[in-house]
A protein has these predicted regions:
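Transmembrane signal-anchor helices characteristic of membrane glycosylation enzymes that use polyprenol
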Residues: 10-39, 205-206
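Transmembrane-helix motifs of polytopic, lipid-linked glycan transferases
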Residues: 16, 20, 86-108
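Short hydrophobic/aromatic helix or loop-helix immediately within or flanking a transmembrane segment
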Residues: 43-47, 51-86, 90
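Transmembrane and membrane-interface helices of multi-pass
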Residues: 108-120, 134
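Membrane-interface alpha helices of multi-pass inner-membrane proteins
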Residues: 119-123, 138-139, 151-177, 203-205
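Short acidic/glycine- and proline-prone juxtamembrane loop motifs at membrane-interface regions
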Residues: 125-131
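Membrane-interface transmembrane helices that cradle and orient dolichyl/undecaprenyl
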Residues: 138-153, 183-187
Length: 206
C-alpha cells in the first residue's frame, strides 16, 4: 500500500494500527483513572513549594528532581491536577513510538510489548515518574549500539535515568562501569595495533 511517497508493507500497517490502538487505550485510561495518594503528593509538592523548597523536600522523597521539574511548570501555570496524567501518558506514547521505530523485533513482538501490562497500566496510567523511566530506558536501549560513536547522547540518557528514581542509580552505575571497561579495552587494543603498525613500518624502512 502506498501512502504519499512511502510504500507501506502489511506488517508496517498492522504495527501502525496497533500503535494507534495503544494511543486510544491510553487516552481512555486518562479519562477514567483515579490517581493514588502518592501521585497527588508529587503534584502538591510542585504546586505549593518553590524550587529551593522542592530541593529541600527531596531528602524525604524517593525521586530526584527531574520528575518534579516536569510537573512544576504545569502546576505553576494553573493547569488542573489531571495534567499529570496527560504528561505520564505522553511520555509513554513517546516510549512506544521509539520502540515501534527502532526496536530490532518483528512487528508482532512490538505489538505485544505495547499491550503488555507495564506499557498499558503500570508505567503510563499510574502517573508516577516510572513513565519517564520507561521512555529513558527505551532510549537507552536504542542508543546502546551507538554508545561508542555517539557517546554524548548515550551519556545524557544515563544521566537523566539517575534523576528519575534512586533505585535506577545502581542500574546506571553498572552500565557506566561496563561502558568504561569497554572503552579501556578499545584503547588498549588500539595502542597494540598502533605498535604493530609502527613495527611493521620500521621493518619495511629498514
Amino acid at each position: 500500500m502506498k501512502l504519499g511517497k512511502h510504500t507501506w508493507t502489511k506488517p508496517q500497517l498492522l504495527l501502525l494500527a496497533a500503535f494507534a490502538a495503544y494511543v486510544w487505550v491510553q487516552l481512555w485510561c486518562v479519562r477514567w483513572y483515579d490517581p493514588w495518594r502518592d501521585v497527588s503528593q508529587a503534584w502538591c509538592i510542585v504546586r505549593d513549594l518553590s524550587i529551593p523548597q522542592i530541593f529541600a523536600q527531596l531528602r524525604y522523597e524517593g525521586h530526584p528532581f527531574l520528575w518534579y521539574a516536569l510537573l512544576w511548570p504545569l502546576a505553576k501555570l494553573g493547569l488542573p491536577f489531571e495534567s499529570i496524567l496527560v504528561l505520564s501518558t505522553a511520555l509513554m506514547v513517546g516510549a512506544a513510538a521509539v520502540l515501534v521505530r527502532f526496536a530490532p523485533l518483528p512487528w508482532y513482538a512490538k505489538a505485544a510489548c505495547l499491550f503488555s501490562v507495564p506499557f498499558i497500566y503500570y508505567l503510563p496510567t499510574v502517573a508516577r515518574s516510572y513513565a519517564l523511566a520507561g521512555l529513558l530506558l527505551i532510549l537507552c536501549a536504542a542508543l546502546y549500539g551507538v554508545r561508542h560513536t555517539r557517546p554524548l547522547r548515550y551519556a545524557a540518557v544515563l544521566f537523566l535515568l539517575c534523576q528519575v528514581h534512586v533505585m535506577l542509580c545502581g542500574f546506571v552505575g553498572f552500565l557506566m562501569a561496563q561502558w568504561a571497561l569497554e572503552m579501556l579495552a578499545r584503547s588498549v587494543r588500539a595502542k597494540k595495533l598502533a605498535g604493530v603498525d609502527a613495527g611493521a613500518l620500521a621493518l619495511m624502512a629498514g
